Amino acid sequence: MARLVAVCRDGEEEFPFERRQIPLYIDDTLTMVMEFPDNVLNLDGHQNNGAQLKQFIQRHSMLKQQDLSIAMVVTSREVLSALSQLVPCVGCRRSVERLFSQLVESGNPALEPLTVGPKGVLSLTRSCMTDAKKLYTLFYVHGSKLNDMIDAIPKSKKNKRCQLHSLDTHKPKPLGGCWMDVWELMSQECRDEVVLIDSSCLLETLETYLRKHRFCTDCKNKVLRAYNILIGELDCSKEKGYCAALYEGLRCCPHERHIHVCCETDFIAHLLGRAEPEFAGGRRERHAKTIDIAQEEVLTCLGIHLYERLHRIWQKLRAEEQTWQMLFYLGVDALRKSFEMTVEKVQGISRLEQLCEEFSEEERVRELKQEKKRQKRKNRRKNKCVCDSPASLHTADEKAVSQEKETDFMENSCKACGSTEDGNTCVEVIVTNENTSCTCPSSGNLLGSPKIKKGMSPHCNGSDCGYSSSMEGSETGSREGSDVACTEGICNHDEHGEDPCVHHCEDKEDDGDSCVECWANSEENNTKGKNKKKKKKSKMLKCDEHIQKLGSCITDPGNRETSGNTMHTVFHRDKTKDAHPESCCSTEKGGQPLPWFEHRKNVPQFTEPTEMSFGPDSGKGAKSLVELLDESECTSDEEIFISQDEIQSFMANNQSFYSNREQYRQHLKEKFNKYCRLNDHKRPVCSGWLTTAGAN
C-alpha cells in the first residue's frame, strides 16, 4: 500500500516530487505526498515462464529501434477510451482523468516506468523499453492485474459506484482499525501535521456537539470556558475546580491559534476512545455543572475532530491509491496492445486474419463436401429416373384420332383374347410356349409353380390359375385348372383322358380366340373366390392393372413356329432372383400379326413421353410404354426352354410356396395398384385404355 512520506507546506507546485510520488489533497490547509514503494512494481524479481519469455524475446528482437519507439507510444484518447469501457464507477473515471491531467501539466514521474508527456502522450522509459525481460514482466505479469483489480472493487448495485466514491463513505463510522492503519502509513512529519489542530475548526466541532446533545445555558457556558482555557484565552488558576491533568499532552499556540496534540500512539488512542461512544450513535441530554466535567467534554470534542481528520486521510489515501493503479494498469494494457499490433504488422499477417483464414478454409472444405454429396445425389437420381424429352404439342384432330385408335386397340385386344365378359371385366392374355391355350391370371405375373403331386400329368390346360382372391379362410387353388401348371406342363389333364393339346388354338388363325374353355373355367373359378374387399375396389384401379398387363405382352412378327400354332412367351417372376419383368411375349398366328400389333405401331404417333417407374423398390431407370413395346421386339429366335428336371428341382426347393402364396399375391397386388395410382395422371394413353376397359 502507498505511504504518506511528506507534507506540501509551500504548495505542491514547488515540491520536488520523486519517482512514483503524487500529491494527496486532504483539505484546504493540508496536502501530503503519497509514494508507491518499489516492491509494488518489481520488474526483476519475478520468475517468468521460460517458453513464453523466449517467444516474447524473439518477437521483441523482430522490431527495429525506431519501430519499437513508435510502438511504445499511446495517446490519451486510447487510454481514456479503455477507461470508459472497463471502469463502471463514475467517481473512479473522474479521478483517473483528473490524475492524468495533473501529470500532463506537472510532468512528474508518478507512473514510472511509464512517462506522461506534455501533449498527453503515454510512453515508456528507455531502460525498460530496450530490456525484453523487464518489458515482458511489465506487460504480462503486472499488466494482467487490470481486470482482477477492477473486478475486486466493491460496487453499489444501485448506481455502480465503488465504496470509496459513494456518499455513505464520507460519514464517520464507529472506531475500528482504519485509523490505526493510516496512522502506521504516515511518516513522523505527517503525524505531527495531523495532530496540529486549528482552534477555529475545534470550536466548530464543539458547537455542533453542544447543539446535538442539548446542553443547557449554564452547562454550555461551562464548556466554552473550558475551551478558552485550552486555547490560552483564560487563566486556568482563576477557575474554581480546574484539573490540569486533563489537559496533559496538549499544548496551545495563542498567536497562531493552534493546538498541538502529543503524537504518541497511546495518547491518540486515548483521545479517540473518548469519542467512541459518540460514533456509536444515540442522542442524550448532557450536563456540565463543574469545570472539570466541562474539560472532559472538550477532550471528547477534540477526539471527534481528530478521528474525523484521520478518517478523511484514510479515505483520500485509498481512493488515490486506487486511481493511480487504474491509470497505471490502463497505460500498460494500452502499450501492450500497441506493441502486439506493431509486431503483427511486421509479421505481415495478424492473428485475427489468421483466424479468419482458418474459418474460411473450414468453410471451403465444408462446401466441397456438401457439393460432393449433392453431386452424388444428383447422379443417383439420374441413374434411377431417366427423363424423356418433352414431346411436341398435338392438335385437336390428332388427339381425336389417338382416342379412336385407343378404342380400336381395346376392342382388338379383347377379341384376340377371346373374352366374352362384359366391359367391366379386365383380363390379360398370357400365352405359353408349349402350344397350349392362353390363360388370364388376375395378378399379372406368374409365381413359381407348386410341387407336383403323384398321379398328375405334366400337361394340363386348366384355367383357374390357382388364384384365390379371398383374404381369409379360402384355400389356395390346386394344380387342377392352374395356368401355372399348364404353362409348366405339370397339370393332370392326361389322367382324365384328355389330350394335352386338345385346347390348342388352331380353330381359326384369323380370330383372336384362344382356349375358350380355359377362359370360361378361369372366369368361373375367379368369380367364386372373390371376397367383399375385392368387390369394393374401384373400376379405375382395375383398369390400371389391365393396362399394366397389356403393356407386358405384345406380338413379335419375327418369331414364328413351323407348326402354325400360336407361340406364347410368359413373364416369369422368380421370387428368389429378380422382382422385375425381364422378357415380353410375342404372338403371331399363321404369319399374320394380331390386331394389337398394328395398334402398337401407331402408339408412338400419339403417346406423350412421360416418366414412369416400375415400382417403389425398382432400381432400374423409368421407361415409357413405347420403349417397353420396342424392347419386346428384341426377343431372340431361340426361346428359353426349361426342362422337366429343372421344374421338379425348382418345386422341390420351394415347398413353402403354398403357405406363403397369399402373401405373394397380396404383395404383387399392392405394388401394381401403387404403380397404377402413380402413373394414372401421367399417361393419357393409359387413361384412355382405362376408360374403355374394366377390372376383375
Curated annotation (Swiss-Prot):
InterPro entries: GGNBP2 (IPR026073)
Key word Nuclease present: no
Keyword match Phosphoprotein: yes
GO CC terms of this entry: cytoplasm; cytoplasmic vesicle; nucleus
Domain of life from the UniProt record: Eukaryota
Keyword annotations of the record: Cytoplasmic vesicle, Developmental protein, Differentiation, Phosphoprotein, Spermatogenesis
Residue numbers bearing the Phosphoserine modification: S360
UniProt main location, coarse: cytoplasm
Quaternary structure note: Interacts with GGN.
Entries under PANTHER family matching the protein: GAMETOGENETIN-BINDING PROTEIN 2
UniProt name for this protein: Gametogenetin-binding protein 2
Annotated organism of origin: Rattus norvegicus (Rat)
Gene of this entry: Ggnbp2
